[in-house]
């Protein structure tokens, strides 16, 4: 009976680890697409006027931030479920995984709730506003927050299968 319970628990942990890997991988992949790759396409490859490209990017960010919220939150929940079902990783691995998941969630929320609306507010003011030092400072802050989240997602992705 005890062996059956251990086997069932191990199967659940294996499934949770796979789900966790899928969630963190999707989060990382989504962030790579909209972070480093999308601006290169929108501003350089398509040859769009900067204000038009910025507006398109704003719409894309608005559409993708919801799924990123869900993925980042789900990563934290699945991490907790893994521990609840008896996984006992080394304390340092568990700590770094939790911190990384929290940083990703915080970065996505800050980016989506503060930076995306703030950047879009500048877009309504026209091309001159987008050339202002205040906009450049805001945009640089958004890039740093997003890059921090992307780095944390990469760390989490590496550590998901570790115990």
Please report, for each region that a protein language model flagged, where it lies by residue.
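Membrane-interface loop-to-helix entry segments
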Residues: 64, 140-147
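Hydrophobic alpha-helical membrane-insertion segments
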Residues: 22-29, 99-112
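Hydrophobic cores of alpha-helical transmembrane segments in multi-pass inner/ER membrane proteins
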Residues: 68-76, 147-156
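Functional transmembrane-helix hotspots
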Residues: 112-127
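Interfacial loop at the N-terminal end of multi-pass membrane proteins
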Residues: 3-74, 79-86, 124-136
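Alpha-helical membrane-spanning segments of integral membrane proteins, especially the hydrophobic core
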Residues: 59-60, 93, 97-106, 140-141
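Cytoplasmic juxtamembrane regions at transmembrane-helix boundaries
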Residues: 81-99
């Amino acid at each position: 009976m005890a062996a059956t319970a251990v086997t069932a628990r191990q199967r659940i942990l294996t499934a949770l680890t796979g789900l966790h890997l899928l969630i963190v991988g999707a989060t990382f992949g989504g962030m790579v697409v909209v972070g480093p790759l999308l601006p290169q396409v929108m501003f350089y490859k398509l040859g769009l006027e900067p204000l038009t490209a910025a507006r398109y990017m704003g719409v894309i960010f608005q559409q993708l931030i919801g799924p990123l919220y869900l993925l980042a939150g789900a990563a934290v929940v699945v991490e907790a479920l893994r521990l609840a079902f008896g996984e006992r990783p080394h304390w340092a691995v568990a700590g770094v995984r939790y911190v990384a998941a929290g940083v990703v969630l915080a970065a996505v929320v800050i980016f989506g709730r503060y930076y995306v609306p703030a950047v879009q507010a500048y877009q309504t003011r026209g091309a001159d506003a987008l050339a202002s030092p205040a906009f450049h400072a805001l945009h640089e802050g958004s890039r740093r927050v997003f890059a921090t989240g992307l780095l944390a997602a990469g760390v989490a992705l590496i550590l998901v299968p570790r115990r």
